[in-house]
Design a protein with these regions (language model features):
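Catalytic cores of alpha/beta
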Residues: 61-63, 82-103, 119-123
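Glycine-rich beta-strand-to-loop/alpha-helix junction loops that act as flexible
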Residues: 75-76, 107-110
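Residue-level detector of anion-binding/catalytic polar loops
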Residues: 72, 103-104
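Conserved anion-binding
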Residues: 1-72, 80-83
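C-terminal helical cap(s) of enzyme catalytic domains, especially alpha/beta-barrels
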Residues: 96-101, 110-137
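Electropositive phosphate-/nucleotide-binding environments in soluble metabolic enzymes
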Residues: 31, 35, 57, 91, ...
Length: 137
């Protein structure tokens, strides 16, 4: 709420995403942290959503059940080549992430690590859009 107060001083409107889960191997976030973060977020009108673990469909499903349908879930840790990265990253598939309850995928090396970044970005856009349409059926 301190950020929102600062925004009000400069007549800026914005929303906050809270970090509820992480996709990197060995991170220190546990289910109690996730629940406490969500409880904190429910008390603020400025929280528009949560960052979830894109590499774990089970954790996304749990997060969706905790936050409900009225909040967005953004998921980093997304790569069409699911598995592990060179620096401890864990990756999940965009389709699986969306099907499990994520609203937005965050892609890093799956795009910037490719020689044809435009084609890579289109592949992620198509995969996530198709998953959104399937989820809506």
């Amino acid at each position: 709420d301190g950020i929102a107060a600062g925004w009000a001083d400069v007549e800026r409107i914005g929303g906050i995403l809270l970090l509820a889960q992480m996709s990197s191997r060995g991170n220190l976030l546990n289910p109690d942290y996730t629940k406490n973060t969500i409880e904190t977020g429910k008390g603020s009108p400025h929280v528009i959503g949560y960052i979830g673990n894109g590499s774990s469909t089970e954790e996304i499903i749990q997060l969706r059940s905790l936050v409900g349908e009225g909040q967005m879930i953004w998921t980093p840790g997304i790569n069409l080549d699911s598995g592990a990265g060179k620096m401890g990253q864990r990756y999940g598939n965009p389709r699986d992430s969306i099907a499990s309850g994520a609203d937005i995928i965050i892609v890093g090396s799956g795009i910037h690590g490719q020689s044809d970044r435009i084609a890579a970005a289109k592949a992620y856009a198509n995969a996530s859009w198709d998953a959104i349409l399937e989820r809506g059926k």
